[in-house]
């Protein structure tokens, strides 16, 4: 019996992640718990046609009565060697929507039976979403901020991750770098980051960098909002940082 796959994505976002036609995802099927490799189906490639997912090869149930675990992830990586340590790297320059969306990692699983219809895994976000809102303080107007080539960078962060598809655990790894955030509007910026402790955000205005130091551990699948206020003082421009807002919810949109 052939099997199909339907997915949906959880839930709230600064910029909803919508999968485009032609997007590719990977899927594993395991009958006795997920193994690093050697599962019933290992890393089959599925392509999204705008409505549903299709495979080049027909995916078959082992039989007509045994339930199986379905584990899916996006984007597809043909070189995966270990389903419990799947490598993923976020983009350093997320200033374009294409690069921003490409930095999102989705994963999910479901337990299905041959007579129960299509497996329907819910895809969760493996990365963390950091939103920085910039406010005009004393001596500034919003128009002045907007005209100053405003930008935001998340600095000194791990760019790579290893994801365990069985439980969604994410371990930061690799080199340290800086992420240029995506401007969702003139005064709001969003970056997708590997889950880790964030210690530094830089606001750029009129080609001058203003560094903000702090410490906040950002968990996978959560959106954090940070408000930064620029104000003019007798000594120049000062930058103050407000508290983080943890939505406690997955960020994302709906695949339809």
Question: What residues fall within each predicted segment?
Answer:
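Short, low-hydrophobicity acidic/polar segments
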Residues: 1-146, 180-189, 195-197, 205, ...
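Generic alpha-helix signal with a bias toward terminal, lower-confidence helices
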Residues: 31, 133-135, 144, 164-166, ...
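Short acidic, gly/pro-rich beta-turn/loop elements at beta-sheet edges
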Residues: 82, 142-143, 162, 213, ...
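Surface-exposed beta-strand edges and their flanking turn/coil or helix-capping segments
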Residues: 85-86, 165-168, 204, 225-227, ...
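Generic secondary-structure microfeatures
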Residues: 134-138, 156, 240
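Contiguous ligand/interfacial binding patches
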Residues: 147-196, 202-222
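Hydrophilic extracytoplasmic domains
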Residues: 207-256
């Amino acid at each position: 019996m052939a099997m199909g796959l339907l997915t949906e994505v959880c839930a709230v976002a600064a910029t909803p992640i919508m999968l485009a036609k032609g997007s590719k995802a990977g899927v594993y099927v395991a009958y006795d718990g997920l193994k690093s490799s050697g599962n019933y189906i290992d890393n089959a490639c599925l392509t999204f046609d705008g409505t549903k997912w299709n495979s080049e090869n027909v995916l078959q149930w082992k039989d007509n009565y045994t339930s199986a675990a379905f584990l899916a992830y996006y984007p597809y990586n043909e070189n995966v060697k270990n389903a419990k340590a799947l490598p993923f790297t976020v983009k350093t320059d997320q200033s374009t929507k294409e690069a921003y969306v490409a930095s999102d990692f989705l994963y999910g699983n479901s337990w299905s039976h041959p007579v129960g219809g299509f497996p329907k895994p819910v895809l969760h976000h493996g990365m963390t979403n950091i939103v920085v809102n910039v406010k005009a303080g004393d001596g500034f107007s919003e128009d002045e901020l907007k005209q100053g080539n405003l930008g935001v960078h998340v600095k000194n962060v791990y760019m790579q991750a290893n994801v365990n598809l069985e439980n969604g655990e994410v371990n930061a790894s690799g080199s340290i770098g800086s992420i240029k955030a995506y401007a969702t509007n003139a005064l709001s910026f969003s970056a997708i980051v590997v889950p880790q402790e964030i210690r530094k955000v830089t606001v750029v205005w009129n080609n001058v960098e203003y560094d903000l130091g702090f410490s906040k551990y950002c968990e996978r699948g959560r959106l954090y909002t940070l408000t930064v206020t620029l104000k003019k003082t007798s000594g120049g421009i000062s930058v103050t940082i407000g508290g983080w807002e943890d939505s406690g919810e997955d960020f994302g949109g709906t695949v339809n």
